[in-house]
Every structure is written in structure tokens, then in C-alpha cells.
Amino acid sequence: MTSSSIVLYEFFDFLKKERRVSVHTTRSYKSDLDQMITYMSDHYEEDDLCNMKSEWIRSWVVELMKLNKAPRSIHRKISSYRTFTKYARRKGLMDGNPVEGVVLPKLEKRLPNVVPEHAMSSLFEDNLFEDSWNGRRDKAIISLFYETGIRLSELIALRLQDLDGQRQTLKVFGKGSKERQMPLLQDTISLIQTHIKERPFNASTLFITDRGKSLYSSFVYRKVNYYLREVSTLQKCSPHVLRHTFATHLLNRGAELAAVKELLGHSSLASTQIYTHNTTEKLKEMHKASPLDRRNK
């Protein structure tokens, strides 16, 4: 194993153990960095990411654009390398930051998909969940996503000790292993506790599959997709849609943007501001019903 391979191995180990990123995210990092190494090796006979130069990154970005890669995909690839450089500089393996000053293609503004409030209400009121331990598990999972806005990776990582029934809180470890305490409704806590008592398997994790194994991304995605399609016409029905829905519905009901930022675990308020557009659009729709608007009709 070469020295550069050892550094990458240690980096991925750091992502898994210290930043607690999901398997899916780790694979994305590996794919992005492998592509970067291949390009460097083919064009500059260099396979050590610590020796990257800014002009090489610019050249790679141009190449990706020629291949008609989406701007969002290019941004993600460079973001993967940026995360690696932060790790490498902290370890004393790099001095400068070759990403600095590199201009990336402009991102198109993409509004988050959101499930309407009436659709979410019908999901919980129309008895769509089976009357069984795994039916209650599914309902608890959907409830947690909608009530807390947690990420898929955060839900999968939840353990029994993270739930505090007395304080009605849930301990969540977000990006960078940042811990936050999420308030929970008593109904949700009771649902989770009932599901745990009824399930026929012993496990240290809060949720398990039908076979008693730890949750994995595609399992949760399929469950969320199934239930949301029962009440929604959205083309994309994923756990992240429920995160968008949580944030938008809170803001629609008058929550402060800063409070929503903390609940979502965002490090920057700018990341949360995208949800304000959805609430603005709703206000515009409501304003169409204004009596003053009828003067011109």
C-alpha cells in the first residue's frame, strides 16, 4: 500500500468513526476522489491528492463541464476534495489550499420539494400503517423525520440510549459528530417505546429491519417512498423530502429561522434560508384572496 493510499484509508476511517458519516456518503467521497486521482494520474502523472495544484483542479472542472456533468455534481466532487484537504492540513500533510480561488459553474436555484400539511395529516389519520410491531416502527420512523427533521444518516445511527423518555428528548449526532437534543412529543415517544417492547429481536439500535438487522439507507428510503406516495403526488418521495417538509411547515407556522437552523443542525443560517422561499410563495397565494384584490375583477 502506497503512502497516498494509506492517507486515503485513514481519511475514510476518520469519516466513519469521527464524523459518523453514512456508508452511502463515504462511497460518494471515495468515488469522487478516485475520479480525481485518475484524472491527475492520466494528465499529470501524479496520484497523491496532497500534491494537488489549483490549475489541475481548474483543468478537471473544465473537463467535467465538457462531459456535460451537472453543476451540482461538479460542486459535490470539489466539496469532497475540500473535505479531504481540511483533514490533510490538520494532519500536517498539506500546507496550502489548492481549492481556494477555483471558480465553479453557477448552481441553478432548486427549491426543496415539500409534502403539503393536509397530506401529512392524512398519512397519520388514515390508518395506513399496519397494526404490528414493524407497522409501528414505520410510523415511528416517519413521525421522527417529520417531527424533528433529522437526516437519514442520523436516524440510522440512533441507539436505544439516545431516547430519553423522561425528558422527552432525542440525542442526535449530526455532521462532524455535532450533538443536538431534539424535543419529542409524548405520542411519538410512546409509539417508539411500544415498538421496542413488541419487536421480536434484541438490538442496541432504536430501529431495526424486519429481520432484526441494523437499518440501512435503501431500506428506509423504500419505506418513506411507499408511504409518501400514498398521500402525495411528488415525483421524489425521500427521507430528505420529509426534512424539507419539517422545516417549511415550521416556518409557515411562524417559527424563527434561527430556531429552525438549530433544529436542522445547520452550521450556517444561509443553508436554512432556502426554505423561506417556499413560505413566501405560500404568502403570495394567500394574498390572492385579499378583498382588495377583488377591486380589479
Model-assigned labels for residue ranges:
Residues 1-297:
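Conserved catalytic core of the tyrosine transesterase superfamily
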